[in-house]
Amino acid sequence: MMEVTQEQLPNTNNAKTLTALLYGCMKLSITPNATWQKAFWIQSQATLSKLNPQEFSNTLYAAAELRIQPPQEWQQAFWTQSQTKLEQFNQQSFSNTLYAAAKLGIQPPKEWQQAFWAQSQRKLEQFNPQNFSNTLYAATKLRIQPSKEWQQAFWAQSQTILRKFDPQSFSNTLHAAAKLGIQPPKNWKRVFWTQSQPKLRQFNPQSFSNTLYATAKLRIQPPKKWQQAFWTQSQGKLRQFNPQEFSNTLYAAAELEIQPPKKWQQAFWTQSQWALQNFNEQDYSNTLYAAAKLGIQPPKEWQQAFWTQSQTTLSRFNPQNFSNTLYATAKLRIQPPQEWKQVFWAQSQATLSKFNPQSFSNTLYAACVLDLKLPEAFKSCVSLNLENDIEQDTTSLRVMYNTRDYLKAQGINLEFKQDTLAKLQKNEDTKISCLESKTGFALSKVLQDMCPHISLTEQRFIDGIASTADFFIDACGEKGLVIQVDGPTHFLNQGTERQCVNGFTAFQTRQLQTQGYQVLRLPYDLLETRDVYDIRDENAPVPPKLADYLKEQLTPYLTLAT
């Protein structure tokens, strides 16, 4: 940019002239020097009371675009004088003023904010898409919560022109709503999906990423057709994604439990691998954690690049980054390289005091599943955590209980209170899914036909794993037969490899078998393809294909029946 000297600033008390000078500098991309700026703010402050709405807006907007910070005294005078004329502002002045304040990081006073929402609400019907988008976006940057009445009017008026929104307006509006924690009305969301879908092909990487991330934060499930269009259109732009866009998009899909298509996944791994060297610690952690939550194993080449590149940033990881990364590797059944593990333990030890119960227990559980040797510093924290925070957190306590044998092998003997199992059983989630319920009806009938004297127990709490089994038969084997119905989350790569259950499912099976239980796992897709959902209630007949399948699965275990 060019520079302007003080001699080019005339000594004037003409408000219009001063505004025009600063606005002209902005249009010409000329940055005034510090001396010129100081003289400008002094002269401008004396004339603020004479500005009209557009001049107020243009002055602050030009300062923001030129990245010139007004002095505190000028800011105070600006808010005081502009507040008296807010009722005369038009839609562009409202939008640009708040947007400029956000860009400059200047917080308007409470009274000004209240007047802004009250006066701008009356003009919302005149707002264009950019005004709507920029105003809400500015509110998020300033962490200002619009009034409830303004929000209602915003949704009502913006809905009428959603068809005119461009990709950035769609993305920024939803992203801002998510940042503010404002849930759009159902009708608005319906129109949003309808109108934004045809324009997805025009979205840039940031618009794709921010839109999906916003839906995840708001817990809004996009329609199936919109999702399909999103994957199709975003796949072609993946090579333009930056690290945060890669990370946020996959993380949002995981939070929404939306499985990206296979081709999109392949393109994602290929393109993101090139960008791994530019990932920050949050990008590394969130990407691997999202892959684990979706049950998607990254390709070997990507994994190798991940370990190499992430190792250099481990010193910047926070407790959640450490915990989520190791937890994801365990779930994905990926064994980190020896050197990476050494650096991981060395760097994580420095932050152990900042681990919350969940981060601590997740890290411990992952280490157990991966059969990693714990460093001495981590070992010394185990008993302390059990005595303090973890005793109050049943999820973490359950993890500690299930890793007791692993810890004992490393020289750590945990002593649990007498009421530990009772506490864990009381807090166990015993909700039964539709699939489990229908499978239970079928198992009971098939078992009755095969061995009438053997009974099936539903929701049996197993002390050895401090968890509830879906079904249990006492008479099979040393301790009995545990039958688990495994949904999609138990499998990697969308369940396409039957032997490829996730790390935690495999660990639970080994744990039960070590303790003397027989274990039968029934995959969801094999039940579904054998018509399990045709069973309407407990009196309905078992579909022949399902009956044959269950008999085949039960037979080896029933030979052990006593």
Give residue spans per PLM region:
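Eukaryotic RNA-binding helical-repeat scaffolds
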Residues: 1-562
